[in-house]
Amino acid sequence: MADAVTAGLVSIPGKAVKLHHLVKAPENAIESIRIREGWNADEPATVYTTPERMPDGTPCTAATVILRTRGCQWWWKSGCTFCGYFNDVRDDVTSLNLHAQWLAAKNQLNNFEGCDMVKVYTSGTFFEDDENPVDWQETVLTETAAMGKHLIVEAQAHLCHEDKIAWVAEKHPGCTVAIGLEAYDDEVLKFHCNKGFRTKTWKRAVDTLQRHGLRAKSYLLFKPPFMSEGDALQHTTKWIQEIAADSDEISVNPMNIQKRTIVDRIFRHREYRPPWLWSLVQMIRDVHADIHPEGEPSRSRLIVHPTAAGSVRGAHNCGSCDKEVAAAIERYSVSGSLLEFEGLSCDCENQWKAEIALDTSLPIPLGSGLDRRLDPVEALLSP
């Protein structure tokens, strides 16, 4: 055993390996390949509108365009533990395909008529040349600028290079770049999320954006894998407080289980449970005064959009109160008012409080938590 190394909880002979290398590459699975090759590369994944707020706080309608692309550079090398965007990407997407998708999105929403904001998501970094052709990047930047729309795109922190950010700022001044920080903690980034960068990289990226007059939006992940509910509530609250001064907007994304990911695997083995909606309400209440100090300008804007809220694969409660609680959280993201949570109550709130109390006093392995929906007898069966 002298030559044994540790991989997770098991000692194996030979060279140490990454967690992802212990799991069959999901992008090579027959089902995954069939799905990816089945969609039309000239049509966007989805296009829709939502209520939003402009940078100055004015209510508006935002168009969201999610495109089918070649995916994210980090996924090609390793990938995050929780991200299933590789399910919607394919290697053979060309510039012509992306231009066709962009045209289809504009046609679907009548050239974004009535929308003051446009969000363009590419399952990776919008302005990374290896992911998306430069001519298509320029088309999106210049057209949205000419339309007078506020543009939001996404990027990885380590890809926010000085020269590229300067180019983006020239083509669309004042746009917003959303960075997937996920956690303001280097250990969580490395061991829970497998993000591939550290917090100082995020800080450097934010400084670069602000130096060129662009807005910085930071994504945080609520309840990364291998973390209990109580720890998630404490850590995310702390992270919001720590990054508020450097972020024009903070978007907290509660974990939702995406297919063929590491999180999907541990979820199916009942070693992970998505967060409670009550935890999100409590988190908002805990940080509201830090984000919106009384009598002072707001330090940032807090956005919480629970994807798949109310389902067993998304943030959920007992099932009877999910719709009402999730709607209140969504309304807060637009209004920024704690009055949205007035009158919310359910019997399951006591169960949530008990779980938080246990999490903060006793170790809970892998953040498994309690089943809120599963039949007790079924829970005894093998996964």
PLM regions and their residue ranges:
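Structural recognition of alpha->loop->beta junctions
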Residues: 80, 172-175, 234-251, 322-350
